[in-house]
Amino acid sequence: MFNWLNFFNFFFFFLFFVFLTTSFNFFCLVLTSELMWALLLLISAVLGSILDDFFLASFAFLLLGFASVELSIGLILMVYLKTTNLSLNLAAHKGSSYATLFLLKKGASKKKI
C-alpha cells in the first residue's frame, strides 16, 4: 500500500541531491527547490490523510507556508539580480545615467589590461 510513497521519498532525495551537487543558474535553483517543497507538501498531506493524523495534515499547511515564503524570496532575489545585471549592462555606455564612478573605473581598468 505504501510502495508509491517510496517513489515520492526517492524523488525528493533525488531532487535534494541534484540541488546540492549541480551548479545551475539561479532560476533553475529556485525551480528545483520549489519542486522539493511541493513534493514534501504532497508527502505530508497524503500521509496525514491516510493515517488520519491532524498534526501531519496541519504540518502540510505549514510546509505550504514555508514554500510560499521561499518562492517569494527567490522571486525577489531574481528581480534584484536581473535589475542589477541590467543596470551593469547600461553602465557600459558612458552617457548612461546608471554609469557610476565605480563602474567607470572598473571599465577603465579592464581596458588597461
UniProtKB/Swiss-Prot annotation:
Its main location: mitochondrion. It is found in: Mitochondrion. Keywords: Mitochondrion. GO terms for cellular component: mitochondrion. This is Uncharacterized mitochondrial protein ORF1. It comes from Paramecium tetraurelia.
